[in-house]
Design a protein with these regions (language model features):
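Structural detector for internal amphipathic alpha-helices that build alpha-solenoid repeat scaffolds
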Residues: 1-9, 19, 27-42, 52, ...
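Amphipathic alpha-helical scaffolding segments comprising HEAT/armadillo-like alpha-solenoid repeats
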Residues: 9-22, 41-55, 74-90, 115-134, ...
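Alpha-helix capping/termination motifs at helix-coil junctions
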Residues: 14, 33, 287-290
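Helix-loop junctions that connect tandem helical modules in alpha-solenoid scaffolds
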Residues: 89-96, 134-139, 169-179, 210-215, ...
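Short leucine-rich amphipathic alpha-helical surface patches
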Residues: 227, 245-249
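Short, low-complexity, Pro/Ser/Thr/Gly-rich segments in the mature regions of secreted, periplasmic
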Residues: 276-289
Length: 290
């Protein structure tokens, strides 16, 4: 497929591949999708046939069709309402772990190549909100993480309908795909700090201790920077931070002791700084949205 897409001086195979999308054999259709994806925008004539396959009985056929539409890009944006509706559907009896939603999350929201990775201009906000609300409940950490791409593309006013869902995605880590579970949690904490959301203070302090251990010796620096951004308001979370210090110094299991001590010192330095802070930025609360 890659060789076909790169070959010059030959008739385009796109029309033939489009015809293959209507053949009875699903494996043949899969192959046509993978090949068409290599042509990117040049595969625009395949959009109607691919959209038809979004209704196929086979889950993986629907996934392949969605991935190919995402690869086509701008010429396939007309299918976005249907794709967002599919994401919003979530888990079903036939798909209890929402695998369809998982792969569509990547196709639409992945920061690298997702259909919505560059802009949300013209996107129906109600459909977007429904998709994000459902997607942030996906059991897979990497799938949830893909939704962080929209956090910086929406104003605070636009974020309000999904703030409760962003909040839950911070405090309830994904049960699988834990290697990537921190992405959506950290992105949520960064968003709360950016908009000075009061609840972010305790969430950030608690996350210092509760984040996944892998690479936490690096991540703790980012988390403490967020902590300090709240200024003197962070003083109310000092007991939580002191508990984290005790945990790192004395109780953290299965983690290099030297790195645990390093994390403890990072938190100590943060406490020292916020104790002397006089900066009190204006905070807002999300209680009215929960």
């Amino acid at each position: 497929a890659m060789a076909l897409a790169r070959r010059k001086g030959i008739d385009s195979p796109v029309p033939t591949l489009v015809k293959m999308l209507d053949l009875p054999n699903t494996e043949t259709r899969y192959g046509a999708c993978r090949a068409l994806a290599q042509f990117r925008g040049k595969a625009a004539p395949a959009v109607p046939a691919l959209q038809k396959n979004l209704k196929h009985d086979d889950l993986w056929m629907r996934v392949h069709a969605a991935q190919t539409l995402a690869a086509i890009g701008q010429s396939a944006m007309s299918t976005l309402p249907e794709l967002l509706t599919m994401v919003a559907k979530g888990a079903t009896k036939e798909d209890p772990r929402a695998m369809e939603q998982r792969y569509l999350s990547f196709a639409l929201f992945n920061a690298r190549g997702g259909m919505l990775s560059r802009s949300l201009n013209g996107v129906d906000r109600e459909l977007l909100y429904k998709a994000v609300k459902a997607g942030l409940k996906n059991e897979d950490g990497r799938a949830r993480g893909s939704y962080s791409s929209i956090y910086t593309k929406l104003s605070l006013e636009e974020l309000k309908p999904i703030l409760p869902d962003i909040y839950r995605a911070i405090i309830e880590p994904s049960p699988s795909g834990i290697m990537f579970a921190d992405q959506i949690q950290t992105a949520g904490l960064e968003l709360f700090a950016k908009h000075r959301i009061s609840e972010g203070i305790e969430l950030t302090a608690a996350y210092a201790k509760n984040m996944k251990p892998h690479a936490s010796e690096h991540r703790i620096k980012t988390v403490m920077t967020l902590m300090k951004s709240y200024g003197a308001h962070s003083q109310r979370a000092i007991p939580i931070l002191e508990n984290a210090i005790d945990y790192f110094d004395n109780r953290e299991p299965d983690f290099p002791k030297r790195l645990s001590k390093q994390k403890a010192q990072t938190v100590r330095d943060t406490i020292k700084e916020i104790k002397t802070s006089t900066n009190r930025p204006k905070l807002i609360s999300i209680k009215s949205f929960l």
